Regions:
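A surface-exposed, charged beta-strand/loop segment in the N-terminal or early-internal portion
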Residues: 53-124
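Short, conserved beta-strand segments within well-ordered enzyme catalytic domains
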Residues: 14, 21, 48-51, 71-74
Length: 338
């Protein structure tokens, strides 16, 4: 079974027949490069690569990865997503592209889809809070606030209004984190850079969800640059931001609550400098493992009548959106029901 591989150390990647050879490289005090024991990865095992350290590779490697349909996602020192190498889009459809563009240009349609993304996200936030409310955390007032704000979404006539409501919903939702978490405090939401451990995990987890959504979008006929909730812009795949809104509460946030409350992560897994807090290498490995386990978790899908993983669920969401855009079936966002 194919899986994601994460490269946290700087190194050199080469093709060796049908195998990827990754050689970690460290630099000593004399600024000399020292090659470490290489690692060999059969290409059949690789779904995608996440690169957090400096990577040296040549065009032959990327040609090989492109032929095998393997994307590579790159991140800077501060864990910010910087871009992706994506294989040639073999599934692109002129009909789908025209329909998606038309849906964006149709103000009524764009508002309708934007509203549904946030309705799905808000529902899943409430389901998250209900889970912990039943387990003794006093979250009812926050739940009521989110429901009240969500009920105003049908009256919103513009995407900006929907974004404003979404901001208020998320602000209320984040106040629950300090109640749910036993030993960590979030305070206010801070980004670029995150100022504490909880904010660091939210940023890192959201980034992982975004890139997983990009992978799913790339496997359909959707164009990742044409979005409905977030404004399409240069140098970003804004449709992935739209779709990932639905899944951040039930994937990212649930993983955060789990790894912190079960003490899989502690303050020793973070590097804090001035007003900046980031996961260290050991912390990243623990969190990535927890995210991958969540992606692979399965549940009984009501409509399909079979078990599906959360990773496959994201892809199903892309197909549902595509069907709506093509006029086949009305889009209904995934709403957690347990």
């Amino acid at each position: 079974m194919k899986r994601s591989f994460y490269l946290f150390n700087p190194g050199i990647m080469e093709r060796r027949d049908n195998t990827l050879k990754f050689t970690p490289v460290i630099v000593n005090e004399d600024n000399e490069e020292i090659k470490q024991q290489p690692r060999f990865i059969p290409i059949e095992d690789v779904a995608e690569l996440y690169v957090f350290g400096s990577l040296r590779a040549n065009s032959a490697l990327f040609n090989f990865l492109g032929q095998k349909g393997i994307p590579v996602h790159f991140f800077d020192y501060y864990e910010n997503y910087t871009g992706s190498f994506m294989p040639r889009e073999s599934l692109l459809s002129g009909k789908a592209l025209l329909a998606q563009t038309s849906a964006y240009q149709n103000k009524k349609k764009r508002v309708e889809l934007a509203r549904k993304f946030i309705q799905g996200a808000a529902w899943n936030m409430v389901m998250n809070l209900n889970y912990y409310n039943r387990r003794g955390k006093d979250l009812q007032d926050i739940i009521n606030t989110i429901k009240r704000l969500s009920n105003t979404l049908p009256d919103a006539k513009a995407v900006d209004e929907i974004m404003g409501i979404e901001g208020n919903i998320r602000q209320a939702y984040y106040t629950a984190f300090d109640i749910i978490l036993d030993d960590f405090n979030m305070g206010s939401r801070t980004k670029q850079p995150p100022e504490n451990e909880v904010n660091a995990l939210i940023s890192f987890g959201n980034m992982m969800c975004y890139t997983e959504t990009l992978r799913a979008v790339h496997q359909t006929q959707l164009n990742p640059t044409i979005s409905f909730l977030h404004t399409p812009g240069e140098r970003r795949f804004s449709l992935c931001l739209d779709i990932s809104e639905i899944f951040k509460p039930i994937i990212v946030d649930r993983v955060i609550f789990k790894v912190l409350n079960k003490h899989a992560l502690s303050t020793s897994h973070f590097d804090k400098k001035l007003n900046k807090c980031l996961l260290n290498e050991k912390g990243k490995k623990i969190f990535v493992k927890a995210m991958e386990e969540r992606y692979d978790e399965t549940f009984r899908h009501r409509s399909l009548g079979r078990n599906v993983s959360y990773k496959h669920l994201i892809k199903l969401e892309c197909y549902k959106l595509l069907k709506d855009i093509l006029g086949i079936e009305e889009y209904k966002p995934f709403k957690m029901y347990w």
